[in-house]
Every structure is written in structure tokens, then in C-alpha cells.
Amino acid sequence: GYTEEGYSYEPQDEMMRLRGFNIARQNNGNVLINALIIFGVDPLSEESKAEGIARAQAEMEYLIPYIRENFKGFEKAELVKTAEQLYVRESRHIIGEYQLTIDDVLENRDQWDKIAIGAYPVDVQPTATQTYGTVIGSPDRYAVPFRSLVPLKVDNLLVVGRSASYTSLAAGSARVIPLGMA
């Protein structure tokens, strides 16, 4: 919906970028917006994540007026609150009995022990301010093997979602919540 408007925003913090809005409506009329990319955050450091949240909150002073002025339908937007945690898409994955690869995804491979079927596009976020995210493929349907949920050397544990045994590129598709719920 608002990709062009997002890319036109010039953040005060040079280590941020506004991307297309992900919008979720709530029953009370509020909307949740996921659109600010915060670069330079170490997802394994609580201090770095806290600094990222503080930087994002400081950016709201400039971002909210920009949204009101440039995003049709948001002329009366008000900030109710910001997220208490950062959404970190990529950090680390378990080493499982099988690692789902980008070839598995793009070649629509079946697996003998499939536990779910994925079809979400391979959506890769930028990792630096000089680059933009991209969709590198749109699979028809691929199988997620049970083996990719089973960590090596750990008993009685299954790992689903973005931390399962996927390569980073395969996770661009397999990370989505519906697959983890399947």
C-alpha cells in the first residue's frame, strides 16, 4: 500500500529506514503498524536491543507528523504506544537433523517426513542502509521436514518458526507464523 511514501521518508536517525507498512486493525479502531527498520542492532545483546527501542521511540517525534502529512487515511493518526520488544527477523537457527535450504524452497521439494507445506515468497530484509530488501522467489509449495524442527544433541525439544533449522535465505519464506503453527 504505502511503499513509495515510506521510502520517501528521511529518518533523523541515519541507521533507520521506513519501508512499506504492515498494518493490523484492532477491534477498538486502533491499528498496529510494523514499518520501521532499525539497523545496527545486535539481536543477541539485550543492551543493543534496548538502545534500538529507545532510538525508534525518539524517531516517532518526526515519523508521526510525516505519516499524517503523507499517508492518505492517516491524517489524524496519533501514537498510542510503541512496541515493548523489537521484532528481530533473523539472528540464529538451531542445527537440526535437516537444514531446509533455499533450493528446497525454490525447487518446491517434497520431504518424506513433511510436517507442513510452505508457499510464502522468499522475502529478504535489508541488512544495511545502503541496500533494500527483495523477494528472491515465490515458491508454489514446498515441504518443511519434521527433521528441521529437531535439534541435534537435545532431547525432547522441537523448534518452530524463525529459529528452526533453516538457512537464512530459506527462512525468508519458512519463518512465517502460519508455518510454525502448522
Feature map (PLM): residue ranges:
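Flavin (FAD/FMN)-binding glycine-rich loop and adjacent Rossmann-like elements that form
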Residues: 1-182
